[in-house]
A protein has these predicted regions:
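Alpha-helical "hinge/linker" immediately C-terminal to small N-terminal DNA-binding modules
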Residues: 1-28
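C-terminal effector-binding regulatory domain of bacterial HTH transcription factors
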Residues: 10, 186-195, 205-249
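Central regulatory/effector-binding core of bacterial HTH transcription factors
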Residues: 35-94, 246-249
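Short, well-ordered beta-strand segments
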Residues: 38-40, 85, 134, 182, ...
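Alpha-helix/helix-capping structural signal
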Residues: 43-44, 113-114, 169, 187-188
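Acidic, Gly/Pro-rich loop/turn segments at junctions of secondary structure
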Residues: 69-165
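Alpha-helical segments flanking ligand/cofactor-binding loops in enzyme cores
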Residues: 100, 126, 172-173, 227
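Hydrophobic hinge/microswitch elements
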Residues: 156-200, 207
Length: 249
């Protein structure tokens, strides 16, 4: 479909959803989530936060069918016909979406104890140039590491290393195999750091805050199934995000 065609198709889908909701209301079922709910999440975030609670959500709403997809790219809700997306970004300015911030995360530097014992622990940001740095890559991430300190200093550093990957999970595995230092999101490393498999490096520095948002196609009407998901996210996912982030503060 062209962009115009995709927009038209989404508008038609919204009209049909409104008609279905009106019919359900007339039959006293407006508040009962049912039908198909299409959810999109960034893959690594979804693995940590969505997967553990998805079965319970489906059991709570047995008349719902959840179509759950993952993506590393900026979601195009209009083209994909997605009802609601979970998305991570430092800034969000796309007027096509209705956004609600549900939490904040950040990324931190970490390495394995064995790597640090062999190559030494960096004492300053300049020392990172002497180390093997493993980097995430996707369209929303720059080739540099942008770091901020507790006293609001900002630092940007070009890094080099033996590995560039598009998923935090792969980098996490490689860091645990003593390959180098990586800048990884809190949710990806929290268990490894808690158990001692990884250690935080240059703990006074981290990435800028990254907002976690629920995104919906920009519209005034939100049907019962989408409302149920938004409520579930706020009750179960938001507190977990907050707890994980506060662990590192």
């Amino acid at each position: 479909l062209t962009d115009i065609g995709a927009t038209y198709a989404e508008q038609c889908r919204q009209v049909l959803a409104m008609v279905e909701e009106a019919e359900a209301q007339a039959m006293g079922m407006a508040t009962k989530p049912q039908g198909k709910l299409r959810v999109l999440s960034m893959a690594s975030f979804g693995h940590h936060y969505v997967s553990p609670m998805l079965a319970e959500f489906c059991q709570t709403y047995p008349e719902l069918t959840v179509e759950y997809r993952t993506s590393q790219n900026v979601p195009d809700l209009l083209a994909k016909g997605i009802d609601v997306s979970l998305y991570l970004t430092e800034s969000l300015a796309d007027s096509r979406f209705m956004a609600r911030r549900i939490g904040t995360i950040f990324s931190l530097l970490c390495a394995s104890p064995a790597y640090l014992e062999k190559y030494g622990e960096p004492k300053s940001l300049d020392d990172l140039q002497k180390h093997a740095c493993l980097r995430l890559v996707n369209p929303s991430i720059t080739p540099q590491w942008h770091l901020v300190s507790e006293n609001s200093c900002s630092y940007q550093i070009d890094i080099t290393g033996p590995l560039i990957a598009d998923t935090p999970e792969l980098l996490l595995d490689m860091v645990q195999q003593d390959m180098g230092i990586a800048l990884l999101p809190t949710f990806a490393v929290i268990e490894a750091i808690r158990t001692g498999r990884l250690r935080r490096v240059l703990a006074d520095w981290r990435s800028p805050d990254i907002g976690v948002y629920t995104l919906l196609p920009s519209r005034h009407f939100i049907d019962a199934k989408t409302r149920a998901w938004l409520t579930w996210v706020e009750q179960y996912i938001s507190p977990k995000i907050q707890s994980d982030t506060e662990y590192f503060l």
